[in-house]
Amino acid sequence: MYQTTAALRSAFLEYFRTNGHQVVDSSSLVPVNDPTLLFTNAGMNQFKDVFLGEDKRSYTRATSSQRCVRAGGKHNDLDNVGYTARHHTFFEMLGNFSFGDYFKRDAISFAWNFLTQELKLPKERLCVTIYETDDEAYDIWTKEIGVPAENLIRIGDNKGAPYASDNFWQMGDTGPCGPCSEIFYDHGDHIWGGRPGTPEEDGDRFIEIWNIVFMQYNRQSDGEMLPLPKPSVDTGMGIERIAAIMQGVHSNYEIDIFQALIKKTAEILSVTDLENKSLRVISDHIRSCAFLIADGVMPSNEGRGYVLRRIIRRAVRHGNKLGASDSFFYKLVPTLIEVMGDAAKGLVATQAIVEKSLKAEEEQFARTLERGLGILDGALNALKGDVLDGETAFKLYDTYGFPVDLTADVCREREITVDEAGFEVAMAEQRSRAQAAGQFETDYNDSLKIDELTHFSGYTELTAPGKITAIYMAGESVNSLSAGDEAVIVLDSTPFYGESGGQCGDRGVLSAKGIEFDVKDTQKYGQAVGHQGALTSGTLSVGDSLEANVDKKLRHRTELNHSVTHLLHAALRQLLGTHVTQKGSLVDSERLRFDFSHFEGVKPEELKAVEDLVNTQIRRNHKLSAEVMDMDQAKEKGAMALFGEKYTDEVRVVTMGDFSIELCGGTHVGRTGDIGLFKITSEGGIAAGVRRIEAVTGAAAMAYVAGQKAELDQAAALLKADSASVVSKLKAQLDRTKLLEKELSQLKDKLAAATSADLAGEAQQVNGVNVLVKKLDGVEAGALRGLQDELKQKLGSGIVVLGIAGDAKVNLIVGVTKDLTSKVKAGELVASIASQVGGKGGGRPDMAQAGGSQPENLDSALEQVIPWLTERLA
């Protein structure tokens, strides 16, 4: 019964569905509207606002199988993954939830009945923990459920503070909290370990399988516990743990999902030892990596993307350890989809993107993996002690892309630890250097704190009255301004848009009779809008009324560029894949810049298709609509939110026909046709996994096209062709140039041969050895190597030294026939000469080259060759 993990998942959800619960799909691994979380790490994450009373749902009972990741940040299991029976970067949490509906009695009954009746687990194998003072739960467990008192364990405050207990759950320092009951399974006395609360509780015999949290208090800032008006329930059961029990195994890595992935990895890498811990690491990591990419995370050097990169690189390193000679990690995705069943729906839709992203990251790391491992191996072999210094760990990170935990993973296998504090010091020093190198003059407004509130009226008007509520000069609040003063003016109401969401701030004028304040920029300061600029005439004081006039032309051009970023975002997702997410943008009156996640460069044909699709949507002349609604409504409409952003309860949703719908607080055109034309001017990578498109619109796009046409016409004139035949004419010209270059090379070879015949006759005898030392004129540096080969052949046995002096540059070459290399090394001789002309060089015993920066010293340097050789050939 329920022998597969997929069957167990279905049984759990069906059980709670029949008991009146709404089955809710797993939310994304990237928490939406909760920047406090790096990744979704519990089933209750998506219901957090419901528990806090900030979100209302149409149901009061829910159940889910939530995909979770614990790697990076506070919840980081990465170091232990693969080495223990139950640590994972990715896991599924089965859960049932009550939002002010049922409480302890039903929650306990639901859990017990599912385990003992549906799954038919032996009751004698189960024991339960409760919070020490939770007598209500004790009575339910003993009197109603029938758990023997000896199988019920009270756990008190065991973490050094009141309510700090394994059996008391709290969301934070304040807010909803309450006692919990945990159900444990006894794997048998053949496994070491003791019951919860005993000194042996850390053993593997008694394993927690279900945690039932009773949220019944609201913790105040002073520590007081106030009863919640509507107590709720949050439960969680790790599917991997219960699957291990149902499948009669002890380690999670022995269940069907992991065994399929382990066997597939072993097949790909031709490994026979299925107990190898590296196989466990890889089987775990493919789950987190594949599902993170499916949910829009791409490998990068910051935030979630860097955690993903660390996991991928750890898996690749373990593959290398097993003998992988080629990319292998991405090949596990089809097996993962197969074993995950219904839980892999999102993965199926993004399979191609996931595989390409994994392969690209693996190939990128492969370029430095071997060399980095060699450096690390050398450092460990030379190590005196059992701690690797942080500087070496940082070098591996900075030069070879080794995350510090990957270095620690390698060291661990040799019982060596990494000085992570030293690593952090080296990292901090690098950041300081980067900041110092990149410092520009800082505007005092960067740190300006303003408490005032400004009403923004600029969605519907560009001219409006406003009253001055505050004035700031050089970061300090002042009451008045005189002509010539530079300041920030805050109004109670303004049509000026303050820079945010990538859209630059408006420019324009604040004026009254005899008064004019030139606004050069507009910024947001909390809930206030600050107009930055200078008073060009008159005087101003707090309380004065002004007319605010936005520069209409600049605002309109900015709106063209902002609106087209929405079309561009939608086009990229449609043509490249739904993994594409916005990573940043800059929109002003001149151009737009759009950064997005993508694992490879955008091909020219893809870029053209994106541009064409955007222009098609412009020509369709969609009407733009902007509506304010609550977040749930926006989600239901399919509005795209920027992951990691914190949105208010009410959000503004901008829709462009049936093509684009996004959350956005910026200003836009009335219809897409207003944009006129969209032209991409460049595309490139700005970081691993992040691409950037720069583009222009409207009149700027027309000017860009006209400029390209003018350049094409100039090229046509130079080629004596019309515009239509420029490409064919240019190709013919390049073919001819290639042919001429080949002929020129052949002529140079003939000239070198002729020159060598003449030069060979100039050789002199030094202690019975033929020696030719010559400064050459009219010979290219590229011909030196061939010329010295020719001369050595002509001499039969001898030494050749040639030099060329150019503009502030010297080129040298020394050739020694093999019969003489025991007496004279070409590298030593060329180094001696180079040191006299401001250079250095080296090479093989029979041929070496060098460069220098002092051509004026070449003659004297060459004069020293014969004495140098005379001494060595004596």
From Swiss-Prot:
Reactions performed catalytically: tRNA(Ala) + L-alanine + ATP = L-alanyl-tRNA(Ala) + AMP + diphosphate
Domain description: Consists of three domains; the N-terminal catalytic domain, the editing domain and the C-terminal C-Ala domain. The editing domain removes incorrectly charged amino acids, while the C-Ala domain, along with tRNA(Ala), serves as a bridge to cooperatively bring together the editing and aminoacylation centers thus stimulating deacylation of misacylated tRNAs.
Top EC class of this enzyme: ligase
SMART domains (UniProt xref): tRNA_SAD
Annotated HAMAP family: Ala_tRNA_synth_B (MF_00036_B)
Gene coding for it: alaS
GO biological process: alanyl-tRNA aminoacylation; negative regulation of DNA-templated transcription
Cofactor: how bound: Binds 1 zinc ion per subunit.
Compartment(s): Cytoplasm
Any one GO molecular function term: aminoacyl-tRNA deacylase activity
Keywords: Aminoacyl-tRNA synthetase, ATP-binding, Cytoplasm, Ligase, Metal-binding, Nucleotide-binding, Protein biosynthesis, RNA-binding, tRNA-binding, Zinc
List of residues binding Zn(2+): H562, H566, C664, H668
GO cellular component terms listed in the entry, alphabetical order: cytosol
Function: Catalyzes the attachment of alanine to tRNA(Ala) in a two-step reaction: alanine is first activated by ATP to form Ala-AMP and then transferred to the acceptor end of tRNA(Ala). Also edits incorrectly charged Ser-tRNA(Ala) and Gly-tRNA(Ala) via its editing domain.
EC number from the UniProt entry: 6.1.1.7
Name of the molecule in the record: Alanine--tRNA ligase
Superkingdom: Bacteria
Keyword Magnesium applies: no
Family designation: Belongs to the class-II aminoacyl-tRNA synthetase family.
Cofactor(s) the protein requires to work: Zn(2+)
Principal place of residence: cytoplasm
